[in-house]
Amino acid sequence: LIRFLRFVSLLFGCALILVSLTADLTGLSVGSGFSRNQWLILCMGLFAIIGGILGAAFAKLYRRTAIMLLNLLILLVVLDISALVVVKLIDADRFRLRQRKLDAGGVHLLHDNVVERYVPFVLWRAVPDTVMAGATTDGEGFRITPPSTVRSDGDTLYLYAFGGSAMWGYGVDDTCTIAFYLQQELASGLERPVRVSNRAQCAQASTQELIELLLQLRAGNVPDIVLFYDGFNDVASAYESGIAGAHLGLRSIEGRIEGDPRAMGRIPLAEDVFRRTNFFLFLGSIGLVSSEANPLPPESYMDHGVSLDSLADDVVSIYLGNTTVATKLSEAYGFAVYFVLQPNIWCGSKPLSACELGFRNGSAAGAFQPGEDENWRNLIRRCYLVWADSISNQGRIFDYSDAFDTCEYPVYTDGCGAHITAAGNRMIAARLADDIMPEDSLEYSENSSPSD
């Protein structure tokens, strides 16, 4: 009987190996290449053959192997629990960030502390009703501008502020954003209630903001003034994709739609399991691994064979096209609209601190990855030069690239090169108020109160 069972085991193992090797030819495999299931069947076949060869000795080998694997499993569990304790002690923010991503459905993370969710047409907004390191969002995912309750009557001036993370207020509290300071400046200058609604979103470009404005107008939310604060993200999206007018993360989203395994986050099972462990969080906390799973290799417009001058011209042309559409909407709906090209660390003549020099050159810790790329620096400077020539005769488009030229103290807060301090936000808000302050305090009073 023992010989018969060994023979059956050998025969069964050979059959399994044959099935795994011929699965593509026999139609048992739906894909091409050697799939995960084929590897599993192959291992089962080898396991059966080993059992057939060893016979009675296989039981002893199996028992010893099982005990060894059980001890290894216990060791891994203890190691993972220990890693969890260490991470909570030395890097609690990393653990809380991962939990916020899981609670939000775990989809999109564009900035270290800002979790986004998918929204039709504009692609993403911050997760609604969330408090993240001093940043509060409302039920729609928009940044709150304190005080959240302002008298809503016919005398209140409503302003919608659109932009990317600089207008959103990345890195500062709710009471230190451009929107907050602008609300104070206008209320003081006009001596009437002012409500500045921060409609900016991290990493959004001007075309996404224009679509957001359309959605607000369609919903019946018509403000008195609309402000667009842009420049950096329009250039950054063109830099990484070689396509003017694109949004950031184009290749990743494009890859998901077209089934690119890397863009869809498909990674080997073993790596996926490892990345879900607390030990992986620990390795990330001490800088030994990256939190990005199998990232797509970085590219720039040069990799796509796009010339600097033509891309810069296209970026400016599309931006100006967006300003034309927004102006037409303002005429149709009866609101005033203004456009501002935001300051950045690569343009203008600001005296830079040692830390800011590191941000500009891409050499500081956490610096904007393309910052050290000469192609990036050339593109953003070229775009701003073309913008300056194109907007010289347009009264409601302002170039703020010189906003900090006389500022001796540090303003830029991180390697992005566009995020600024609370003091910098106050300076921008004061200049905005001077540029858009109506001569008549009742000049903007025709629209009904929009939704906040």
Predicted regions and their residues:
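Catalytic cores of nucleotide-enabled group-transfer and carboxylate-activating enzymes in metabolic
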Residues: G55, A59, I178, L182, ...
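Internal/C-terminal transmembrane anchor helices
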Residues: L61-V87
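Histidine-centered active-site loop/cap adjacent to the catalytic His
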Residues: I2-R3, Y319, I391-R396, Y412-D452
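Membrane/wall-proximal cationic-aromatic binding patches
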Residues: D91-E185, G189-L190, F404-E408, D452
